[in-house]
Amino acid sequence: MNTNQVSTRQNSLWLIAAMAAPLAKGASGCSWPAVLAMGGFTLLVGWWLGRYRMAQKPWLDILQGLWTSVIISEMLYWCGDCWPSHGNGKAAALILLALSTWSACRERQQAARVGCMLIWPVGLLLGLILLSAAPEVKLQYLYPTWQMPDAALVTVLLLTTLYTGKGKGESAGVCVGFLCFAMITAVVAAGTLSPYVSSTSKAGLYELSRSISFFGVSQRLESVAAAGMTIGYFGGISYLLSIPEEAANRGRMVLAYGALAGLLFAMNIRLDSRIIAVGSILLWIIFPAVCSLKNLFQKPPKTA
């Protein structure tokens, strides 16, 4: 969670570009009450992390890095789901991983500049899909119902909270923005596809792009959705791989974590998304809290 080598604003822009596609994937499979509940939980976690000190042990850094590889391998599956009609989703995902690893191997400031540039294509392409589908929303599909939230959404929301500067004022606004984006995506996906279809689809935004019509004429925007999501996953994977910035062997760590993610994906070793979510909560919230019981309720010193 070290972000001191890039400015807070730069980190926020990079994080927006990196997490927009994973967040859209998770939110498109959830009902809006579930998104609201999970968003409120992660905002509370962000406030807590910003208010109280959390210890970080070397062994915990290693476990978090290994678990990050598991999350990245899951993102590769999400990327492959964006290209179901082409039959080469696995190859596209592996190429994406190679490019993301190459980007992350450079200095973090350079990777951040590249990541910030992604906010424009990701925002425009995903925004086009959501705006085009909004007129197709049926109000009867938006009746409040509770569905167990997609565990992928839990993991992504947790990541957005962890890497936004630990509760600083400008970062709190980014977290609220992520929650609003997730709510809009959930409402548009469920209102257009129906709650059942959106919750059972592997790639809700891709399915959403097939249900758009202009003036009664059906439009096929699958390529637009797939391109926007793929660019977003590139940003997300490169961001996660770029997190270890202060280690002397940073380049080798990035290559090792990227290789582990690729190996898990190539060998079809995939954990259930609920296990990934529980593991993320344990490694980034529970274990650090247990390791820092002495200063858990000690407020951090004020900075000038």
List where the protein language model places each region.
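Membrane-interface loop-to-helix entry segments
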Residues: 90-94, 100-133, 277-288
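Extracellular/periplasmic helix-loop-helix junctions in multi-pass membrane proteins
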Residues: 251-254, 262-282
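Membrane-interface interhelical connector segments
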Residues: 192-221
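Helix-loop-helix connectors at the membrane interface of multi-pass transporters/channels
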Residues: 75-88, 166-183, 237-261
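Membrane-water interface regions at transmembrane-helix termini and the short interhelical loops
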Residues: 25-29, 53, 81-84, 96-117, ...
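Membrane helical hairpin/interfacial module
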Residues: 16-93, 97-98, 287
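Hydrophobic, membrane-embedded alpha-helices of multi-pass small-molecule transporters
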Residues: 5-25, 34-42, 64-72, 105-106, ...
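Hydrophobic alpha-helical segments and their helix-loop junctions in multi-pass secondary transporters
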Residues: 72-81, 120-144, 189-190, 290-302
